[in-house]
From Swiss-Prot:
Molecular function terms, GO-annotated: rRNA binding; structural constituent of ribosome; tRNA binding
Known partners and oligomeric status: Part of the 50S ribosomal subunit.
Disulphide linkage map: none
GO cellular component assignments: cytosolic large ribosomal subunit
PROSITE patterns: RIBOSOMAL_L1
GO biological process assignments: regulation of translation; translation
Protein name (record): Large ribosomal subunit protein uL1
Family classification: Belongs to the universal ribosomal protein uL1 family.
Keywords: Repressor, Ribonucleoprotein, Ribosomal protein, RNA-binding, rRNA-binding, Translation regulation, tRNA-binding
Superkingdom, natural source: Bacteria
Amino acid sequence: MAKISKRAAANKAKVERTKFYPIDEALSLVKECASAKFDESIDVAVQLGIDAKKSDQVVRGSVVLPAGTGKSVRVAVFAQGDKAEQAKAAGAEIVGMEDLAEQIKAGKMDFDVVIASPDTMRVVGTLGQILGPRGLMPNPKVGTVTPDVATAVKNAKAGQVQFRVDKAGIIHATIGRRSFEPAALKSNLAALLDALTKAKPASSKGVYLRKVAVSSTMGVGVRVDQATLAA
């Protein structure tokens, strides 16, 4: 059995595993327990009332967090002509077509997000086995395949996060950093939960947002009392 560090043990002792904390207290605890030497990310896990095995209940989408993610994002765009110029003007670091595809095939992937204009999918489609496993394959469901590449670039730069339910019916997402003010983390969490609610499958029955828990990169998970989320 792995040995728990003194810091991890001390943090674990601060949190009651079965207790549901008011959101303000939950975020305060998470920030307090985020004692690593780097600016830890603040993450959320949301248990959804869906059957992830059913194709019509796969929850997937994206949302621009109002307070951003605290991360600098490098964007690559597949576009040509006017759309290529629009992508560059919007701040994309890399814009190309076959040349960009060759870079990717050669393992040169110095970017965090890939956006594609629909007319470039003949090129992008050949990269599925490379980009797919890395979570980088452009997809219209999350707004990364779009004719409006400029807006997509701006959204990515502004703090857009993508979400997709896992096999256990849980959504995992980052809502900021330890250095964020609690109000910023709350606004980001509210935006994410609103996006999840809007993405609720029509076939999902019963309670949809079942459990919400927040944590930091190296810290413990803290369950949230959902009744306090609207406060």
